[in-house]
Amino acid sequence: MPLCTLRQMLGEARKHKYGVGAFNVNNMEQIQGIMKAVVQLKSPVILQCSRGALKYSDMIYLKKLCEAALEKHPDIPICIHLDHGDTLESVKMAIDLGFSSVMIDASHHPFDENVRITKEVVAYAHARGVSVEAELGTLGGIEEDVQNTVQLTEPQDAKKFVELTGVDALAVAIGTSHGAYKFKSESDIRLAIDRVKTISDLTGIPLVMHGSSSVPKDVKDMINKYGGKMPDAVGVPIESIVHAIGEGVCKINVDSDSRMAMTGAIRKVFVEHPEKFDPRDYLGPGRDAITEMLIPKIKAFGSAGHAGDYKVVSLEEAKAWYK
């Protein structure tokens, strides 16, 4: 099975009203942990690489690890996605290396400049059958060393942006933020999910929810129990994510939850078995913790059982969509 494009994967999700998890990866164990979950549940999946991940692991290493997942699990639709590409050059590099989807994030620019940059990326990507996600509005928190304050996506701006750029998916700002500290407290959680359906109806394309880690209390407690310091971490309730999926969100970005699951498991090994020094003795439990974390999420997103619903279209075939 070839790599799946974001357009096809999210098009199916939008049609059948479920969400697909987009899980950030940095190394082999994360990819294996994610794949174990989606294989067990027969779910499509998006493996995405951020700028920080590419600096850490190198784009070629990560691409080859993701391709290994595709080779080992040919029955699972897999999209390899560049997360938060910030320049045309970085996006071109990912496309030329064989990524099936890219995000160009020019949301920190004024509207017209965001449109201009995004159109350049769309032209380059679509000529090669590659899907494009863009962002309008800004999320709070810190994403790869870039600090932002929240600016919610305006529905009419979203409609105009999609019409002008021709993007395949749009990341909308509805009050979530990057990182594990999304809100000051659980009582402070405020999300503008009411905007999602309006934007979905106006644009007619799949929407993306960034900053969607739930920061489960049991995982946070484990980290703190074994020497960590995350007392004030607060995430997005899974119920809010499910609500957003029902309104038009099709791609759900999750990063912090996987990191926390792996960190908690590794800390536990270090404290309970200080004699261990073989990386397999702690990376293995970390990998398993990711699987355990993601299984209930994937079920909640509704994508379980949908891996065999469609025949994946190759990038070469996908070029015809844009002619």
Swiss-Prot record:
Pfam family, one: F_bP_aldolase
Catalyzed reaction equations: beta-D-fructose 1,6-bisphosphate = D-glyceraldehyde 3-phosphate + dihydroxyacetone phosphate
pH effect summary: Optimum pH is 7.5.
UniProt pathway annotation: Carbohydrate degradation; glycolysis; D-glyceraldehyde 3-phosphate and glycerone phosphate from D-glucose: step 4/4
Positions contributing to Zn(2+) binding: 84, 178, 210
GO BP terms, alphabetized: fructose 1,6-bisphosphate metabolic process; glycolytic process
Annotated phenotype, changing residue 255 to A: 9.4-fold reduction in substrate affinity and 50-fold reduction in catalytic affinity. Has some activity towards tagatose-1,6-bisphosphate
GO molecular function: fructose-bisphosphate aldolase activity; zinc ion binding
Binding site for beta-D-fructose 1,6-bisphosphate: 50, 178-179, 182, 211, 213, 253, 255-256, 259, 280
Binding note for cofactor: Binds 1 Zn(2+) ion per subunit.
InterPro entries per UniProt: Aldolase_TIM, Class_II_FBP_aldolase, FBA_II, Fruc_bis_ald_class-2
Top-level EC class: lyase
Required cofactor names: Zn(2+)
PROSITE patterns per the UniProt record, alphabetical: ALDOLASE_CLASS_II_2
Source organism superkingdom: Eukaryota
Entry keywords, A to Z: Glycolysis, Lyase, Metal-binding, Zinc
The keyword Glycoprotein appears for this protein: no
Effect ascribed to mutating residue 83 to A: Severe loss of catalytic activity
EC number(s) from the headed UniProt entry: 4.1.2.13
Record-annotated active site: 83 (proton donor)
Observed phenotype of the null mutant: RNAi-mediated knockdown is lethal.
Function: Plays a key role in glycolysis by catalyzing the cleavage of fructose 1,6-bisphosphate into dihydroxyacetone phosphate and glyceraldehyde 3-phosphate. Does not cleave D-tagatose-1,6-bisphosphate.
Alphabetized PANTHER family for the sequence: D-TAGATOSE-1,6-BISPHOSPHATE ALDOLASE, D-TAGATOSE-1,6-BISPHOSPHATE ALDOLASE SUBUNIT GATY-RELATED
Family: Belongs to the class II fructose-bisphosphate aldolase family.
Subunit annotation: Homodimer.
Annotated protein name in UniProt: Fructose-bisphosphate aldolase
Organism: Giardia intestinalis (strain ATCC 50803 / WB clone C6) (Giardia lamblia)
Lineage: Eukaryota, Metamonada, Diplomonadida, Hexamitidae, Giardiinae
